[in-house]
Amino acid sequence: MTKLTVAVFSYNRGAYLEFCLASLARNLPHAQVVVYDDLSDDPATQAVLAALKVPLVQPSAVARAQHGGLYVNMARALAEVETDYLLFLQDDMQIVRRVDDQDFADIAAIFDADPDCGFVSPLFMKAGIARKLHAQYQSAQGLAAYQTSPEIPRAEMRFAFADVCLAHVDRLRDAGFTVVEGEGHNEAQAREKFSQMPLMSAPFAFYCPEVPTFRNRKRPLSGQIARLRRRPEGLGYHDMTAAEVADFRARDPAIWPFAEDFLTPQNPQVRKPFVFQDFQGPLALRVLARVEYLLLSGGRRLRRLRAKLGI
């Protein structure tokens, strides 16, 4: 019986979508996979979508929110899923090792240990937020997970939800959890309804490094420049070998699963610690990206103010 549905959210990154789906076929072959595409208009991506061997869902109209139709599609996936678990995944991600019965047993044990648990993170940890993670989590005795430190009050939980996570479908529905626009709003809702999201100590998924990024469905200038200098080497990571997975599972849980310590990029020239947007490479591009963001956010604030004033 299929226990897991993987909802892959896609927009204009055809090569990455292919790469993501190939990793699912290799490493999570028994999962039900559905692609939710936000009406990609890139010809190369459209060609990938036309050749899909898994179900494709697209909206009837283009979403105008900052994140496009991501949250609308996440809500639709949650409404339509018929399996025990739902993995929210994005097209710029990879399943980096074989997922087996031991993993499903670990996941079930994590949920069984806490009836208030609605989400589990299957992701390797980002080195850039190590301090925040150490402040909020500790190794969970008897579970293949890191859980919230007991002294952390619910109001101070910072990882109740993430756009990429593994959801316990029945618990979300029983609690009346619905995906709304904005990760912060979803996290606030999750904080009210559930305990903080545990992190798997033997995760199996991660973000590809230095990926093309969109804002309001458009490539920023910094991203366009980054694309011109993009190295042609591999998009993601080498799959972990069986021996590496065995050592990974057997390690002391005091050694946290930070991606840089366990994953080997196909392109050895990617920046470390890993960055996940292509304009986060050279300093000049990072500065340009920051200026673009400030101009964009300032423009939104001005439009909201003018709307309130009726001018």
Please tell me what each predicted stretch does.
Residues 1-22:
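N-proximal low-complexity "stem/linker" segments adjacent to membrane-targeting elements
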Residues 115-134:
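Short beta-strand-to-loop element that shapes/binds the nucleotide-sugar donor at the catalytic cleft/hinge
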